[in-house]
A protein has these predicted regions:
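Short N-terminal targeting/anchoring amphipathic segment
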Residues: 13-32, 45-50, 224-227
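Membrane-proximal helix-turn-helix segments that form the acceptor-binding/catalytic region
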Residues: 71-109
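Helix-loop-beta element that forms the nucleotide-linked donor phosphate-binding surface
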Residues: 101-108, 117-139
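Conserved donor-binding/catalytic core segment of Leloir-type glycosyltransferases
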Residues: 110, 148-166, 172-175
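Acidic anion/phosphate-binding donor-loop and adjacent secondary structure
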Residues: 137-153
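Nucleotide-activated donor-binding/catalytic signature segment of Leloir-type glycosyltransferases, i.e.
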Residues: 188-221
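Short alpha-helical segment that forms part of, or immediately flanks, the ligand-binding pocket
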Residues: 214-215, 238-245, 259-260
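Nucleotide-sugar-dependent
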Residues: 226-238, 253, 259-260
Length: 352
């Protein structure tokens, strides 16, 4: 379907008495901006932009330079001097802002965490009043498993993508330093075969089963997870899977929402450098884990999709709507019993 056909189809639906309530945008990479503007010019629907990474700030979506966070604030010649991404990112920002300024009266930016909002809004302070936070998941109940393990051996895991910016290199450094100690068993959870002796690979693919990783962490009684993301994670499903399995999380202070949640929930330790991580395993990791298990700071029994997403559906007047508020002239109604149909635009598939 091309842009013209889509507009004709939506007009036909409107003619039958329906109404396009809202448009949800989940990514701007490779988006046909002209097609998007043609659609928004035709329809007065509310626009919700879901920010899942920092690609609208910089085309280097991790915002890492030489393995370190670039810093808060707007991109500028002074801040980004010598960066290969600067010129293209500045061009993109100018194009985005032209569109956003035109839509200001019906636009809302939705973030999965306060951390993500803080980083993004520091680059776009003029839109901060159009921002809100809706986490991807809700934590339900209490999981009481994996807290009574009195074994003298700790199960230590790396979880998910083995990219350097996710901390795989640091995990291997830790493994190589500690691998001969009988106090640790080493695990990798994901889709790869890491090919490293004494690292047990547990195949997990959440694409086949969304609960696969959580179940695997619980079944294997993982004690410690090294979540050493170098970038400011906007959310981190992996963290919440660890939280729900009562796993002690060790993370870097620059890991974004991972570090924020560890400090908030008290289910791990935030350290300042890889050197501090190595020292922790040399000296006090066992005491830290046993103290955590003794305090029984339980994680959730269930992780459910957050139905607050329904707040981003502008409903008609429904007698069973249970709440309404106005943000930026947008009527936000919340009704957990009713799933409103969402028009989810996949702009990369649109052609001129």
């Amino acid at each position: 379907m091309n842009t013209k056909d889509l507009i004709l189809a939506l007009n036909a639906v409107n003619a039958d008495g329906a109404h396009l309530l809202s448009i949800h945008i989940h990514h701007w990479k490779n988006t046909n901006l002209e097609a998007f503007q043609r659609i928004t010019d035709k329809f007065d629907s509310s626009i919700y932009m879901f920010v899942h990474d920092y690609s609208t700030v910089c085309s280097n979506f991790t915002m890492l330079r030489h393995g370190e966070f670039c810093g808060y604030g707007k991109i500028s010649e002074e801040k980004c001097a010598g960066c290969q991404y600067y010129t293209g990112s500045l061009k993109n920002q100018n194009e985005y802002k032209k569109i956003w300024n035109k839509l200001k009266n019906r636009l809302m930016f939705v973030f999965p965490s306060d951390v993500a909002l803080k980083v993004w809004a520091s680059a776009y302070p003029e839109y901060e009043n159009l921002c809100c936070v809706i986490p991807h998941q809700k934590c339900i109940g209490k999981y009481k498993g994996n807290l009574n393990n009195k074994s003298s051996v700790l199960n230590v895991a790396f979880i998910g993508s083995r990219e350097d910016y996710k901390g795989w290199k640091v995990f291997l450094e830790l493994y190589n330093k500690e691998k001969d100690k009988p106090t640790f068993k080493w695990f990798y959870f994901g889709v790869d075969d890491v090919g490293v002796s004494n690292i047990k690979c547990v195949y997990v693919d959440n694409r086949q089963d969304p609960m696969a990783m959580l179940n695997a962490l619980r079944q294997n009684n993982v004690d410690v997870a090294i979540l050493w993301s170098l970038c400011k994670e906007t959310y981190s499903y992996t963290y919440f899977e660890c939280y729900a399995a009562n796993v002690f999380v060790v993370t870097d202070e620059n890991s974004g929402n991972i570090a924020f949640q560890v400090l908030k929930n008290g289910n791990g330790k935030v350290v300042g450098s890889a050197t501090e991580l190595l020292n922790l395993f040399d000296n006090d990791i066992t005491n830290n884990v046993y103290r955590f298990k003794t305090e029984k700071k339980t994680g959730p029994q269930l992780l459910l999709t957050n139905d607050r997403i329904l707040e981003c559906c502008d409903s008609c007047n429904l007698s069973n709507a249970i709440g309404e508020k106005v943000i930026n002239h947008l009527k936000i109604r919340s009704n957990p019993l009713l799933y409103l149909e969402i028009f989810h635009m996949k702009l990369r598939k649109l052609r001129k």
